[in-house]
């Protein structure tokens, strides 16, 4: 048998990493296959912890300041599905940001939920997403019987919502708040802890420890931030949504990564912040990431541009010619993710790579609008309906069975159960002409309700 995946991984594994996972390919714990065990005598059971895993949960809870913390090995995706199931019942209205992660959209399908969308503020001139409008939030909860709200903070690019104000508004109406804090586990070990979801009073909080701090991919946590939900509630849904074969190596990596953060991570984060300040000074960094709808930007997310290149081109050039792996690139920006495991020398090499490019004009930003289409069916009803594949050009007035959106930025043009308009068809044409990937499009066809 050929081993194409192994061959490709070996090609890139030794390059400097400014992407996920947070361990950056460095040996931060004993990854010994002999430790890849199951639920035998003395090793406890993640789905009903009463021994060493329960003890570990208590240690994690102390670090994060939660009522209870629980390991999941299905990533933040699985943890979000647990949280959404805990907080809702079929047919409930749930408030979500339109630019939310696909796992939350899939949670709508799994739980047969009716989404009420919050527009995430989009700056057309900067092609950047920020926070949410508090007046719109108040209007949505006054005019809808909302069962729960799911927020994302920090976002992929590091913008942190004004969570205290938002959660206060929602809790005044007794609405449970779930925060997808997948990109924010490191906040609890920095001065930004005061902006974290648990400190802001969220009811359920999800962290991907593998994203920003050292642990293996799929390592995640779900926290109870309040007593709105019980330990029994959490355990019941963990048993439904978490695998019955949780990886002990993933669990051990969470333990090792959090131990590292507790012992060394705080001081290393301070050092990396200073390193990044030096890099930005050296390259005359002038991107304005501020907006009144966000309270802070995560300094461990580094968004930048190179003259004359798209972000995708920068990512490709870095990995081929600079031996540096970045997290992602879009039509305008490249994104690097820094963790405490990165070194000052690696950030120096990132600086030198950026300075190696000639000055020039940046790619012109094309302003875009992302209006929310009319909804005719609930997501689950649309998804389970009989469908047919047709050319997107012939889809005007049809109901979508899937998410169709531009990547970047990844926001749905149309989601499950929404009506495809002439405007959406024109948008798809525009994106394809600009070389932007359109998810949900297979060749030129999309799936609609028959």
Regions found by a protein language model. Give the residues of each.
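N-terminal "arm"/small-domain region of PLP-dependent enzymes with the aminotransferase-like
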Residues: 1-51, 175
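Conserved PLP-enzyme active-site core in the AAT-like
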Residues: 2-8, 27-29, 76-289, 306
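Conserved N-terminal alpha-helix of the aminotransferase class I/II PLP-enzyme fold
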Residues: 33, 37-75, 99
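General small-molecule cofactor/ligand-binding pocket signal
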Residues: 70, 116-118, 327
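Short glycine-rich or small-residue beta-strand-to-loop segments that form or flank ligand, phosphate
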Residues: 70-72, 149-152, 337
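Conserved C-terminal alpha-helix-loop-beta "cap" of PLP-dependent enzymes
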Residues: 284-416, 422-439
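Charge-dense polyanion-binding interfaces
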Residues: 437-450
């Amino acid at each position: 048998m050929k081993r194409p995946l192994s061959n490709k991984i070996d090609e890139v594994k030794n390059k400097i990493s400014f992407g996920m996972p947070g361990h950056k390919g460095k040996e931060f714990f004993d990854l010994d296959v002999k430790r890849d065990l199951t639920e035998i005598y003395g090793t406890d059971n993640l789905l009903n912890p009463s021994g060493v895993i329960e003890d570990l949960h208590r240690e994690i809870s102390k670090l994060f300041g939660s009522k209870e913390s629980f390991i999941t090995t299905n990533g933040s995706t699985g943890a979000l599905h647990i949280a959404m199931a805990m907080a809702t019942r079929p047919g409930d209205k749930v408030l979500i940001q339109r630019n939310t992660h696909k796992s939350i959209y899939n949670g709508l399908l799994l739980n047969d939920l009716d989404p009420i969308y919050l527009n995430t503020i989009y700056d057309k001139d900067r092609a950047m997403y920020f926070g949410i409008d508090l007046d719109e939030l108040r209007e949505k909860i006054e005019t809808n019987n909302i069962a729960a709200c799911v927020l994302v903070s920090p976002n992929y690019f590091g913008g942190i919502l004004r969570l205290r104000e938002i959660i206060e508004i929602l809790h005044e109406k007794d609405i449970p708040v779930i925060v997808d804090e997948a990109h924010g586990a490191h906040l609890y070990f920095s001065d930004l802890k005061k902006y974290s979801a648990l400190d802001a009073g969220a009811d359920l909080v999800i962290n991907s420890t593998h994203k920003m701090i050292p642990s293996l991919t799929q390592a995640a946590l779900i926290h109870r931030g309040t007593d709105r939900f019980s330990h029994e509630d959490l355990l019941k849904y963990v048993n439904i949504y978490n695998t019955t074969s949780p990886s002990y190596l993933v669990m051990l990596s969470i333990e090792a990564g959090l131990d590292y953060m507790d012992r060394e991570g705080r001081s290393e984060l301070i050092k990396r912040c200073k390193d990044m300040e030096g890099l930005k000074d050296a390259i005359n960094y002038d991107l304005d990431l501020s907006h009144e709808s966000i309270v802070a930007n995560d300094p461990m997310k580094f968004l930048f541009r190179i003259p004359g290149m798209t972000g995708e081109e920068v990512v490709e050039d870095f990995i081929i010619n600079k031996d540096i792996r970045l997290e992602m690139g879009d039509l305008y920006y490249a994104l690097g993710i820094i963790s405490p495991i990165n070194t000052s020398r690696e950030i120096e090499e990132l600086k030198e790579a950026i300075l190696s490019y000639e000055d020039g004009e940046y790619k012109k930003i094309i302003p875009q609008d992302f209006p929310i289409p009319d909804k005719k069916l609930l997501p689950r009803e649309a998804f389970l309906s009989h469908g047919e594949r047709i050319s997107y050009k012939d889809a005007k007035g049809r109901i979508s069975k899937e998410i169709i959106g531009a990547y970047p930025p990844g926001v749905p043009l149309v989601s499950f159960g929404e009506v495809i308009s002439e405007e959406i068809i024109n948008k798809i044409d525009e994106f394809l002409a600009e070389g932007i990937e359109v998810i949900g499009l297979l060749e030129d066809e999309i799936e609609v309700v028959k």
